[in-house]
A protein has these predicted regions:
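Primarily the internal scaffold of c-type cytochrome electron-transfer domains
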Residues: 4-6, 94-126, 173-215
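The canonical Cys-X-X-Cys-His
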Residues: 63-72, 84-94, 140-146, 163-170, ...
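Nucleotide phosphate-binding site architecture
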Residues: 59, 88, 134
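A short, flexible N-terminal coil/short beta segment enriched in small residues
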Residues: 18-22, 90-95, 99
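Short Cys/His-rich "knuckle" micro-motifs
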Residues: 76-80, 97-101, 150-154, 174-177
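N-terminal export/targeting leaders of redox proteins
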Residues: 1-52, 56-60, 64, 68, ...
Length: 215
């Protein structure tokens, strides 16, 4: 019986199979890298705000404590955004006529809040509580980076589940004394010794169950 296919068909079939496997692996790699990239996570992306507010100036230069503006960070899930009343406590006297602060003055006069652009935007299916993390010795800079050095706030961490779990599985690597939580420049001298001691002292558990963050 004569052959229907040319003998070169075997080689072509092998090339097709190997090529399909290669393309599949390549597409999977691209998908994983895209998922981790700033294009998807928003990491390192500066967002222009309605008011040119500089944390470097207010926190780094003037030494204003995080809690002066983010008043509920120790007591609630949300750290809280300051009302323009908080801004005007200082800016009634300082830069009172600056054109850059006109949106702040307008908000103060009308009572209409400034529509800030959210930088750290977690999915609706994820639950995060600032007060719990603060009480357990997780510093602001651990998640937000050196806010005191940012002219415009950007997302310093990827905020992916993998990133969160790195800390939840190994809290001793990241935890700090509670009195240093709001110290942006804090660096532990001996984290290998201090971390495990604080984990035990603060009763920190390695919580990795899905229901901890996803209700």
């Amino acid at each position: 019986m004569p052959q229907i296919f040319h003998h070169s068909t075997n080689a072509l079939a092998k090339i097709t199979i190997y090529g399909a496997v290669f393309i599949g692996v390549a597409l999977l790699w691209v998908a994983v890298e895209l998922n981790r990239s700033s294009w998807n996570t928003g990491q390192w992306v500066e967002k222009q705000q309605p008011v040119q507010f500089s944390h470097k100036h207010h926190v780094g230069d003037d030494g204003i404590d995080c809690r002066y503006c983010h008043t509920s960070v120790e007591t609630a899930a949300s750290a809280g955004m300051p009302s323009t009343n908080t801004c005007m406590n200082c800016h009634k006297q300082i830069w009172a006529d600056s054109p850059y602060l006109e949106p702040v003055r307008a908000s103060f006069r009308t009572g209409k809040p400034i529509e800030w652009i959210r930088v750290h935007d977690l999915p609706d299916y994820s639950y995060f509580n600032h007060s719990i993390h603060v009480k357990q010795g997780v510093g602001c800079a651990t998640c937000h980076g050196r806010i005191d050095q940012m002219n415009f706030v950007y997302q310093a961490s990827p905020l992916t589940m993998e990133w969160c779990l790195n800390c939840h599985r190994n809290p001793e690597k990241y935890i700090r004394p509670r009195e240093e939580v709001f110290n942006m420049a804090y660096v532990a001298k001996n984290q290998e010794v201090l971390g495990p001691r604080l984990v035990k002292e603060y009763g920190v558990n390695k919580l990795t169950s899905c229901s901890v963050c996803h209700y």
